[in-house]
Amino acid sequence: MPYQFSEDEDLKMLRESVRKFANTEIAPLAHGLDEREEFSLSLTQKMGELGLFGTIVPSEYGGQGMDYLSYIVAVEELARVDGSQAATIAAHNSLGAGPLYYYGNEKQKKQYLPSLCTGEGLWAFGLTEAGAGSDAQASKTNATYDATKKEWVINGSKIWITNSANQLTKGITVQAITGKKADGRNELSCFLVPTGTAGVKAKAMSGKMMWRASNTGELYFDNVRVPADAMLGEKGQGFKIMMETLDNGRLSIAAMGLGLAKGALELTIKYANERETFGQPIAKHQAVAFKLAEMATRVEAAENMLYKACWLKQSGQAFQKIAAMSKLYCSEVAEFCAREGQQTFGGYGLMKEFPIERHYRDAALLRIGEGTSEIQRLVISRYIGCK
């Protein structure tokens, strides 16, 4: 498949559709939802009706069957306006429905995916713990097998889990320790745990700096029993599932970074052409014009890197190195554009009613979530031959 720099008609239509939705449905509500730290049930359901749930899942399971670039463009367009709504869709697709589709057996796919592709429900990915972020081997959540009842018993907790504690949450994929490997490291496995399961407690977290209108939960598992067939993939496959899921998730975070950067650039260009000092628009001052030129250049570079990673993935080639580079670069370009945009807005950039202020806060998470910038540099260094 040749690498193309132009969008086909289907992709153009998708971009226009999501952009229109973001501008007309999300933008008018974004400030209020952020201020109230409110997860919007109605907006989430509308995004489901638009076809943004189950984007990469084939139609036989109720999904849209999009290629990966189309999904990434949809996330990008949402993030251009509001990081919170983009986070809901990105986490649900790459961390929720994605692992179910890629690693689930037929029974699991048919049981869960149809409702997760329509906006009826959300699914979360329980990986991070209070003492286990970048170091997944430090996990404490464990699962022991009760051979008599043919059930796994899960105990532990997870934290900062997107989409895990709201009215639409249907379940969580939980990574837990199921034994020890020959080398002494923890053996990790994944389990599908519906939210109504006895012993599961989900608490919505508040007081966030960013993504205040997305749902983030703290999860507790107290002798949670799930049947043997609730295991996702094979026993001991948890680390592989986690790593491959995060490879895909890095593209989602990169898309959010690219979208945020584009949104910040658009807002700043508009403001710079309207705001006057010394008798002319500030965009005519070299100090501002050159800043905008630098922002635009970095956005262009970020877009090309991310789209190349998507092309590699959907053409069946190794994409993991470029995914890590894209996540790293797009998140840092987002921070740069939000910061420079806020600086250009001056005092107005510090006021919450101006979207650039929200972009500035939202950008902070992108350098941390799904692998910090430091971890991305470590991953990249290994790919390029640093031993």
Q: What kind of region is each of these model predictions?
A:
Residues I89, G131-S134, T162-Q167, K180-A182, ...:
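Short Gly/Pro-enriched turn/cap motifs at secondary-structure boundaries
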Residues M1-Q85, A91, Y103-Q108, S115-E120, ...:
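Alpha-helical interface subdomain recognition
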Residues A91-A97:
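Short, conserved phosphate-binding/catalytic loop or strand-edge motifs used
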Residues A138-K140, G196-P227:
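Flexible, small-/acidic-enriched active-site or ligand-binding loops
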Residues G119-L127:
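A short, Trp-centered hydrophobic/proline-enriched beta-strand micro-motif
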Residues E151-K201:
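A short core secondary-structure module
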